[in-house]
Design a protein with these regions (language model features):
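Local beta-strand N-terminus motif with an aromatic residue
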Residues: 51, 187-188, 232
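Residues at the starts of beta-strands that form the adenosine-phosphate
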Residues: 105, 129, 165, 233-234
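Conserved Class I SAM-dependent methyltransferase catalytic core
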Residues: 220-267
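Conserved proline-anchored active-site loop of SAM-dependent methyltransferases
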Residues: 107-116, 187-204
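Mobile active-site "lid"/loop adjacent to the S-adenosyl-L-methionine
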Residues: 195-223
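S-adenosyl-L-methionine
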Residues: 1-105, 114, 133-190
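Conserved SAM-binding loop of SAM-dependent methyltransferases across substrates and taxa
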Residues: 113-127
């Protein structure tokens, strides 16, 4: 892990207030050293402590600041309009491909900013559950905190509840899946992967900064097939044309009018 630390916003630092309970819990879990804000600027703190990344707890968000001036903070992104469409009775391609039903258990192996996870959680309803894995400690910290604290007036109560039902875990999916092998029966109905694309078609500045901390390890056929033995229904992998030619699926859905499609491997 790069050299990093966590601190408070200027307003909290000015009043000698430390990290909130949730931020402190994250710092303890990820072993992130806490430094005093002392009314200093972010650039000054990064320089003073020779940091690669500084996490700053702002109001309702945890922001990652890089040495080069870029920053990354949580936003639910496309899950906002997607959930609105679902509420209006429209279909969602991913939800349809997953084949989930109310009460199902889903494992999202690549949380990222959790746009897909939030949408899935909403579709599952309060009876369902979703666990979201993230191998990058920085992305895990920012997104995990954001899921718990995001508070934008335009978001519906149902959406905030969907965000709150997601269980984030900082772990490589290879490790987590290997541990699942020891269970007597499948723990999840559906397992989902959204590997990070090395060459995005287009992206916002927020996604660009997230990519600095992302894990680009490729999904292998071995892991894909292992996942197929650990779920009750199917494994679904989001991919863009040409990015996952090395993987073999039972079928591919989508892609006719979109650059994205989904590979499906039925449970074994």
């Amino acid at each position: 892990m790069n050299n990093w630390a966590i601190t408070t916003s200027k307003s909290r630092g000015k009043h000698n207030l430390g990290l909130s309970e949730d931020a402190q819990r994250l710092a303890n879990e990820l072993k992130i050293p806490e430094i005093a804000r002392d009314n200093k600027g972010i650039g000054k703190l990064i320089e003073q402590y020779a940091l690669d990344i500084l996490l700053v707890e702002e109001e309702n968000s945890l922001v990652a600041h890089w040495q080069d001036g870029q920053s990354f903070n949580y936003h639910p992104g496309m899950s906002v309009p997607r959930i609105k469409h679902i509420k209006d009775g429209d279909s969602d391609m991913l939800v349809d491909v997953l084949g989930i039903a109310s009460g199902d258990r889903v494992l999202d192996c690549t949380m990222g900013m959790a746009s897909d996870a939030v949408t899935i959680s909403f579709a599952l309803g309060p009876e369902g559950s979703i666990t979201a894995l993230e191998s990058s400690p920085v992305i895990y910290a920012v997104t995990g905190y954001g899921l718990k604290h995001w508070n934008w007036q335009q978001e519906s109560k149902a959406m905030r509840q969907a965000m709150g039902r997601i269980v984030p875990i900082c772990c490589k999916y290879e490790t987590y899946l290997q541990e699942l092998r020891e269970k007597e029966k499948p723990q999840y109905d559906v397992i989902y992967f959204d590997p990070m694309f090395e060459r995005p078609i287009m992206e916002s500045s927020g996604i660009a900064s997230l990519r600095k901390a992302a894990d680009y390890a490729p999904l292998t056929q071995e892991i894909l097939e292992l996942a197929g033995t650990l779920c009750r229904k199917r494994v679904v992998v989001k991919h863009r044309e040409g990015t996952l030619k090395h993987l073999h699926f039972d079928k591919i859905e989508g892609g006719k009018y979109s650059t994205l499609s989904y590979g499906i491997l039925n449970a074994k």
